[in-house]
Amino acid sequence: MRQYNVTGMSCAACSARVEKAVGKVPGVTSCSVSLLTNSMGVEGDVPPEQIIAAVEQAGYGASEKGAGEKKPSGADATALEDKETPVLKRRLIASVGFLLVLMYFSMGHMMWGWPLPAWFEDNHIAMGLVQLLLAGIVMVINQKFFISGFKSLWHRSPNMDTLVAMGSMASFLWSVYVLFAMTRAQVDGNMEAVMDYMMDFYFESAAMILTLITVGKMLEARSKGKTTDALKGLMNMAPKTAVLVKGEKEVTVPIEQVEKGDIFVVRPGESIPVDGKILEGHSAVNEAALTGESIPVDKEEGDLVSAATINQSGFIRCEATRVGEDTTLSQIIRMVSDAAATKAPIAKIADKVSGVFVPVVILIAVVTTIVWLLAGQNVGYALARGISVLVISCPCALGLATPVAIMVGNGMGAKNGILFKTAVSLEEAGRVQIVALDKTGTITSGEPRVTDLVCEPGYDEKTLLELAGALEKKSEHPLAKAVLLEIAQRKIATKEVEDFQALAGNGLTGILEGHRLLGGSMKYISGQVTVGKQVKNQAQILAKQGKTPLLFAKDDVLIGMIAVADVIKEDSPKAVQELQNMGIRVVMLTGDNEQTAKAIGAQAGVDQVIAGVLPDGKEAVIRKLKEYGKVAMVGDGINDAPALTRADIGIAIGAGADVAIDAADVVLMKSRLSDVPAAVRLSRATLRNIHENLFWAFFYNIIGIPLAAGVWIPIFGWTLNPMFGALAMSLSSFCVVSNALRLNLFKVKDSHRDHKIKNEVTLPQWEASKGEKNMTKTMTIKGMMCGHCEARVKKTLEELEHVSEAQVSHEKGTAVVCMETEVADEVLKKAVEDQGYQVENIQ
């Protein structure tokens, strides 16, 4: 999508006109115009020159945003600066100054008996001329209304400025006519007519309309400026300089000059300038700027750091990995600003109304004037009713109702580490009825941890870990990392084993100080040493809880068992409970067997567990779930991308794969499941705010226009002076924007006001097919020449833990592996390659 800056827009009718004009350009597939940010997003294979020409032909200005330019993360902050308010403030001060003098002459003497210079006594012509001059000056000060309004009218796309310009100009021209008529009457000596004409002056209305609308515009501009505070805050976080290492020297350079691969240093208290990898040193880094999490994260050599985060302690030397618009901060800024440039589906209602609103209002004003003339009223009275209709009508309130709430909602999300990529995702997240959670990395941490230690008599936990660690230290198995992490946390020293062997599909063996050590699965160890019934029962209990028991022996005698599992995150049960309290059904998807899956599901408290789902089968499950309601998919892996795309709302955990993040509609920077209900909560609050804004905008116009037209005069005697109509118009947009700003006070983590949705869904019990109960992987193997090779590979694979069957063909060079639960590709590959064959691919 190409982004453009658009100038000259003043209300929703303007944005609708630009959108319509660009949408007609051949090759444009979609166009979205944001009145709030004066920007436009265009999709389609069309040269920028054609787009700009279409906008200019519609009576506005456009320029392409600098795509692909190398610039710092905060370079666009100036584009969001409130340049409108200072200009409007100067116009308002000047307008009020002349308006007060005008009001003194037009109403002060007549209504309150305020003194006038002697030469004005009974000099009605002079009074009229002074009012004409003062009103003219106010009109010149506010000439932008007339230039924009009549220019839009000329291009057959009238806007709010057209209504204001027509109302003010009509008042002024009528008053000029009355002044000439009064002059004629005074020449004729008809003083009674002169006094009547004095009452028909509307010079003060012409000036007052412009001044009051300027008041409203200034308040609106100031409030609109506040809606982008979150985005401007993100942009201003970007450091302006970096300290690069050039040979033996340290050189401070502008951030724009930092290249990928440069070496930079960061001292305590300084901001990290670009994304990088720590080469030397360690520190605690405050990542609140990106994640909203105030607790510093410990970083050491090899860890990644992000731009705009704060180095709180320690000197670090880093290599730049992402610079300019590729940094994490820049991507966040781009997501938030792109979301503001898109339109929510609910905005289409206001857009359709705004597109025809101004022409209809002009027609109503003309009809109102004619009807009152036909009813026998004089021209001045009828004109006042028509002018009131023009100046009270406000398309701006309609046009701003949705985008201001979307902008504030997006800003609140960004502050809390929740990034909505589009306005559609912000709106739709609150309507979700089913949330499907990937198990690994979403509900669980994604990294195995030691959960249980069971020691045989004569051995304690420390000794068990010392002996187990000696073996696992040389193993490449994923579960070995969990054991070594536990040893590191307990600060237990381990010794080196000799004659170490990793027996593929079986276990580990080695010699430590003359003693033979064994380690591995129940299947392997029970074939080597005697395993008591009590230990076997304990192993079964642990397996039912979703844990993997690892047994260890010394000199053919069992010494203990270590249970390892991918433990659930601390906040997962609470997050699931909060979603359920909102009336949302929570489903867990996993490739594990049913027993393991149900154990994890019970700990998390999900409504339903769907086990044995292949990586490429998640998309099919989401498609099936969508038959029952609106579905959100939460995942973090590459194999989650199809499911994230298929779901109504795809939510990616921020620590996951880039592919998953690209496929998602919402990105959770903190990688915490509790941010899923927070995202739903924020979406609902934003949607509620939009409904309030739209109600006010429609209600205001439905009540205001009939009142201005004089519909209630025959019944209640209610009438509306054009000046009060202008005041009402100026405040309407301000009220809408102010209401949207209330979202800044919303607490996304507060679950006390959560309520269930009206249309809760009921899910049937999921029956996994035979194909879903057993995971399969297809291995492409090079080097198998005969049936003996087949048998060898088949035996090796079937001896692996959780492998139920292996179908091997030396003709095809493949092995189809059926598993009770997922076995890591590395384990399968190592088992086969240890037998002398080459694994080319695993799918």
Segments (PLM) and residue ranges:
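Transmembrane helix-loop-helix hairpins at the membrane interface
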Residues: 87-241, 352, 453, 717-722, ...
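Flexible metal-binding regulatory segments at protein termini and peripheral loops
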Residues: 1-126, 224, 249-252, 334-342, ...
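P-type ATPase nucleotide-binding
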Residues: 450, 454-582, 594, 606-622
